[in-house]
Amino acid sequence: MEVPPVMRFARIFALTAFAAGSLLVAPAVPALPACQHFYTGPIPDRPVTGGHGPGTLVGAVNVANRLPAPGSVSGGLGADGKVTFTFARVSGAKAYRAFRNGQALQWISDWGQPTLTVTDASPCQNANYQLYAMTAEDNSPGSLGQISTAYRLDAGNRLATYRVPAGTTLSYRVTSYNDVAQTALGYSAGPGFCAVDARNIPWGTRFSVPGYGECYAADIGSWIKDDIVDVWLPGSQADAWGIQRLTLTVR
């Protein structure tokens, strides 16, 4: 029996719509878990005690005398639940390190491969991805380049540049440390360098601290979690600083 033209058209339309629908539906990407602080041990309660600063305000540190940071970051979250991205080479670099929220994610040696790629198999919500280049494979402080801007997944699950907007004010507890060592970014710890929770304040962020001066986020700490930053002061000045609740201003 011949099928009426209207029925033939309806059947073809239905099949076409079904096929189009099957092409338009992308694999579901599971929701990412919240990012956790890297230190899982106990952190003592640190109530505000008050204190005072050094008197002379600290100026902004100069971090320009290093290899430039890698750029041209491109990638995002895939259907496999991993974040994968590529980045551009830096002239003079022998290797690179990638970080998620201030924690080492991947070491990339440059042996001339066509593409430099980073993969995060365990991504989390609003993670800050950052990179630096190295002049040598030994990760010595003198070989480390400048830290890149942070990159976060946008609404389309693609990586996009991220920074805390200039002028943002943050009500934080501010503590002080006096360790004579290297910061996580390989700078000699000293005035103007600060430790942050890199989930909230990415490395490389500059901000002012009342009574202290200018801070450059270049370090992390086991007890530096959530609304705490740690400023560097020498010797007894660190003790005299105490624990203060202050309003930070992002530069």
PLM features: what roles do these ranges have?
Residues 8-22:
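Sec-dependent N-terminal signal peptides
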Residues 21-30:
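C-terminal segment of classical bacterial N-terminal signal peptides
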Residues 97-124:
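Recognizes extended acidic, P/S/T-rich segments that occur
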Residues 95-99, 206-208:
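Beta-strand signatures of extracellular beta-sandwich domains
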Residues 120-140:
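Beta-strand-rich modules
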Residues 59-91, 140-153:
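Pro/Thr/Ser/Gly-rich low-complexity, intrinsically disordered linker/stalk tracts
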Residues 34-62, 125-126, 151-251:
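Solvent-exposed, well-ordered loop and adjacent helix/strand elements within mature globular domains
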